[in-house]
Swiss-Prot record:
This is Mediator of RNA polymerase II transcription subunit 20. It is found in: Nucleus. GO terms for molecular function: DNA-directed RNA polymerase activity; transcription coactivator activity. The keyword Nucleus applies. PANTHER family: MEDIATOR OF RNA POLYMERASE II TRANSCRIPTION SUBUNIT 20 (PTHR12465:SF0), UBIQUITIN SPECIFIC PROTEASE HOMOLOG 49 (PTHR12465). Component of the Mediator complex, a coactivator involved in the regulated transcription of nearly all RNA polymerase II-dependent genes. Mediator functions as a bridge to convey information from gene-specific regulatory proteins to the basal RNA polymerase II transcription machinery. Mediator is recruited to promoters by direct interactions with regulatory proteins and serves as a scaffold for the assembly of a functional preinitiation complex with RNA polymerase II and the general transcription factors. Belongs to the Mediator complex subunit 20 family.
Length: 212
């Protein structure tokens, strides 16, 4: 894999999530991007079981268990303000056995699904983010394949993002700053998705005006 940027695309004013996704994919197709199948990234939140906290008023920590269709044999466990564990798919079974330590938060499942597009050395994924039956937002992932060091290709990624996101082009992901000259890996992408999902969850708690 290469270096990846994950961002949120605001819903266009007067349009639905699905209509905005269609506008975005149409722009990509006009640029010459070709469809390359579908993708899915999902996330379920677990919190520390009350029985493990003791009586000192400790605050429970969160853990996010995630899957990415690009890595069908792997499961990612991201600890709140901590490391990312990459395990095999049996990790989900292990979480059931660990219910005395971690418990699944109610209605915490969030996922994004959509279409993959290939444009020269760029792989683009535009997805609809859903919680339960409802569409909550739009995710955009762009990967530049030939490079594995974020600082070496961010300007190129930025230029490509501007070509179809325009004024909604994101800034450099926080994970780039943490790993400026390090080799980029799948865990870095999952951290970005975790941050995106948490941002969208928070947006559901306050009314958001349409964006032109």
């Amino acid at each position: 894999m290469g270096v990846t940027c994950v961002s949120q695309m605001p819903v266009a004013e007067g349009k639905s999530v699905q209509q905005t996704v269609e506008l975005l994919t149409r722009k990509l197709e006009m640029l010459g991007a070709e469809k390359q199948g579908t993708f899915c990234v999902d996330c379920e939140t677990y919190h520390t079981a009350a029985s493990t906290l003791g009586s000192q008023g400790q605050t429970g920590k969160l853990m996010y268990v995630m899957h990415n269709s690009e890595y069908p044999l792997s499961c990612f466990a991201l600890f709140e303000n901590g490391p990312c564990l990459i395990a095999d798919t049996n990790f989900d079974v292990l979480m059931v056995k660990l219910k005395g330590f971690f418990q699944s938060a109610k209605a915490s499942k969030i996922e994004t699904r959509g279409t993959r597009y290939q444009y020269c050395d760029f792989l683009v994924k535009v997805g609809t983010v859903t919680m339960g039956p409802s569409a909550r937002g739009i995710s955009v992932e762009v990967e530049y394949g030939p490079c594995v060091v974020a600082s070496d290709c961010w300007s190129l990624l930025l230029e490509f993002l501007q070509s179809f996101l325009g004024s909604h082009t994101p800034g450099a992901p926080a994970v780039f700053g943490n790993r400026h000259d390090a080799v980029y890996g799948p865990a870095d992408t999952m951290v970005q998705y975790m941050e995106l999902f948490n941002k969208i969850r928070k947006q559901q708690q306050v009314p958001v005006a349409g964006i032109r």
